Design a protein with these regions (language model features):
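Transmembrane alpha-helices of multi-pass eukaryotic membrane proteins
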Residues: 2-6, 286-300, 350-362, 382-399, ...
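Interhelical loop segments of eukaryotic multi-pass membrane proteins
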Residues: 25-32, 311-337, 370, 377-391, ...
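TerminUS-proximal long segments
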Residues: 249, 601-651
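Soluble extramembrane domains flanking the early transmembrane region of eukaryotic membrane proteins
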Residues: 11-293
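Membrane-embedded alpha-helices of multi-pass membrane proteins, especially ion channels
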Residues: 10-21, 299-312, 362-378, 398-411, ...
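Cytosolic juxtamembrane regulatory segments of multi-pass membrane proteins
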Residues: 330-344, 495-511, 587-589, 651
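Hydrophobic alpha-helical transmembrane segments corresponding to the first two to three helices
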Residues: 274-447, 474-483
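Hydrophobic alpha-helical transmembrane segments
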Residues: 229-245, 332-342, 370-374, 399-413, ...
């Protein structure tokens, strides 16, 4: 009951707790009233540009836009660096409640015979063709691009396009469909003008909140990008009838003038609710409520059935076995009791099983702690990069748990190569992850992407692994091997029992296929939204739902694996160690198939490098998910088998 109430609280706070960690509002004042605590200048920061057609993001200055000195750039945390965020100051001059109309920003000139100018123009064209998106920030709020989609719904996105492209057959793509003037075949229209609408809450007369006059707080920022062909910076025309600015690589010189307009508009929306309009416009958000509850009802119903079957059947079996032990005419054991002398026989490759279970325990605890903190709003989208930073720090700290569990399990399975176990626990899985990460980082370096982790950060990550995670693993392993071995409730025979011929449904592969489908059915809806947040750059904030799905995943993995293990034991197959891990871990195979389906049906990613990067990152995700779900099934089965063989009398 307490867990259920906690989840309800999480569901509530996941929607409204964006500013719990102390992200204080900033008050802005008019120029005459400005001070250190109430500034007049409203800085606009630019971030990376990314695309749903490419996995490779770029820094703002990689394209030939208007820039200023980057000395005053905000310091990114580790999570922001790993996600490729590069927040930089911009040349846009915005002041509180100061409207501007068609202000000149900068001028870019391209000479026909200059190879560097042609390269810059071609990069702009490539960005427009792949629909690269700006990510601007004002007062820690994303600058949003709002439009009406084909279903006549108003959608607001936390990014806006740098331009658009019209195909050679005259078909407008992406943002070109929003204006019928973008109609010239095989043309690139650069959005060199932006109309910025800033909605603010006026606090200057709110005496209940402040004992001194303040101006207001920024609530919403919306932008309308446009393409305008300016001829002279002294005679700018930003009207609705302005001619668009196509970008072409020709033998003629070309000039591009960048301009902007700013309009301030008061609103009654409170500062604490300023994210709502972005979150409410996320596609399919409302569908999630019904789908999650529907899945919850189905899964709980199936879990209840499985639980009752197991409890009633086991209760009858245990009572019958104990009754037969008291009867003098009991000639032969049968059922799962028949394999009591082999059920705790150490498996093959016990070393790798212990390493996988240790790392899986580390991942499960990290996920649990991260979700518990996130569902209360402390790792919200308003706190950029905090989710990845928090998860990575806890992954490193929980290395001590990985070492302890791996060592304790390996000792329980009568393993002798304790040094190898310690080294594999510390280096095997992290080494695979770092190897894939390093190769993908080389690809991003070659593409000069903002997602390429700088050398200093790479050294820092390597140091975290070698000088913090590894010693913690050694410490955990020391205490794991120092502890007593878990004693099995029954003795193990010296000669292994021969496993009889198995039926189709008790063979390993059919069992894994059946054991993985139910847990996957619990997560695939949430998986769609998670993949959208990663690859379609949508905001993900329903951590309360994710925590609930995580709990359901644990329950279904446990019960499905226990049920299949019971059937295998009844069929006199005692090889449950690896099978319990692989049965629930096979959920990762369905996850990988779904990621392939998502790639082919939902994404429009083009290019070999982007495809390689997508499946490399997917491979990391699937591998970690395999370890986590496999660990759930293993521990559930281990506790189940230990319990049932402790409940029967064995001579």
């Amino acid at each position: 009951m307490k867990s259920f109430l906690l989840l309800l609280v999480c569901l509530t706070y996941s929607l409204d707790a964006f500013y719990l960690p102390g992200l204080a509002p900033v008050n802005f004042c008019e120029k005459e009233q400005s001070s250190n605590t109430c500034p007049n200048a409203v800085p606009l920061f630019v971030n990376k540009l990314d695309s749903d057609q490419s996995v490779i993001p770029y820094e703002y200055h990689s394209f030939d836009f208007c820039t200023v000195s980057e000395e005053d750039s905000p310091v990114e945390n580790l999570g922001q660096v790993l996600f490729g965020e590069r927040i930089r100051p911009s040349p846009y001059n915005i002041s509180f409640i100061e409207n501007k109309q068609c202000s000149f920003l900068c001028e870019k000139e391209y000479k026909s015979g200059d190879a560097e100018d042609k390269r810059r123009l071609k990069l702009l064209q490539r960005g427009m063709k792949l629909n690269y998106q700006h990510h601007w920030i004002i007062d820690n709020m994303p600058v949003s691009f709002c439009f009406t989609n084909q279903q006549q719904f108003n959608v607001c996105l936390p990014s806006f396009p740098m331009g658009c492209y019209v195909t050679p057959d005259g078909r407008p793509k992406d943002a070109c469909v929003l204006d019928n003037r973008y109609d010239k075949p095989d043309s690139y229209y650069l959005f060199n003008h932006v109309d910025i609408l800033v909605e603010y809450r006026d606090l200057s007369h709110d005496s209940n909140m402040f004992d001194h006059k303040v101006g207001g707080r920024v609530i919403r920022i919306k932008v309308i990008p446009r393409s305008i062909k300016h001829t002279d910076k002294n005679s700018l025309n930003c009207g609705e009838t302005a001619v668009p600015q196509p970008i072409s690589v020709t033998d003629e010189n070309m000039k591009v003038l960048y301009t902007y307009s700013v309009m301030w508009k008061p609103t009654d929306v409170k500062w604490s609710s300023r994210w709502d309009y972005l979150l409410d416009s996320i596609p399919h958000t409302n569908i999630q409520w019904f789908s999650i509850m529907n899945s919850l009802v189905i899964v709980l119903f199936l879990s209840g059935m499985v639980g009752m079957i197991l409890l009633r059947t086991l209760h009858r079996d245990i009572a019958r076995y104990n009754q037969l032990d008291n009867e003098e005419d009991a000639q032969e054991e049968f059922g799962w009791k028949l394999v009591h002398g082999d059920v705790f026989r150490p498996p093959q490759s016990a070393m790798f099983l212990s390493v996988f279970v240790g790392t899986g325990t580390q991942l499960l605890l990290m996920s649990s702690i991260t979700l518990a903190v996130a569902c209360f709003g402390f790792l919200s989208p308003a706190n950029r990069g905090s989710l990845m930073t928090f998860a990575l720090v806890w992954y490193v700290l929980l290395s001590v748990v990985s070492g302890y569990v791996s060592a304790r399990l390996y000792k329980t399975m009568e393993g002798l190569a304790w040094k190898t176990n310690i080294l594999l626990t510390a280096f095997f899985v992290p080494g695979i992850l770092f190897g894939i990460f390093f190769v993908t980082n080389l690809m991003l370096w070659a593409k000069e992407s903002s997602a390429a982790v700088p050398f200093g950060t790479l050294v820092a990550l390597l140091s975290l692994w070698l000088f913090l995670a590894t010693p913690l693993t050694f410490i955990g392993s020391f205490f794991g091997f120092k502890g007593d071995r878990v004693i099995a409730p029954v003795r193990t025979n010296q000669i292994p029992r021969q496993v009889p011929e198995q039926t189709l449904y008790t063979k390993p592969l059919p069992g894994m296929l059946m054991g993985g489908i139910l847990p996957f059915g619990c997560i695939f809806i949430q998986l769609f939204f998670i993949l959208n947040s990663i690859w379609a750059h949508q905001v993900y904030y329903m951590f309360g739902f994710l925590a609930l799905v995580f709990l359901i995943l644990i329950v279904t993995c446990s019960e499905a694996t226990i049920l299949l293990a019971y059937f295998h034991l009844c069929a006199e197959d005692y090889h449950w160690w690896w099978r319990s891990f692989l049965t629930s871990g096979f959920t990762a195979a369905y996850l990988f198939l779904y990621c392939i389906h998502y790639f082919t049906s939902k994404l429009t990613i083009t290019g070999t490098i982007s495809t390689i990067l997508y499946f490399a990152y997917t491979g990391i995700f699937v591998f970690l998910f395999f370890l986590a779900t496999g660990t759930i099934g293993f521990f559930a089965t281990y506790l189940f088998i230990h319990k049932i063989y402790s409940s029967v009398k064995v001579d």
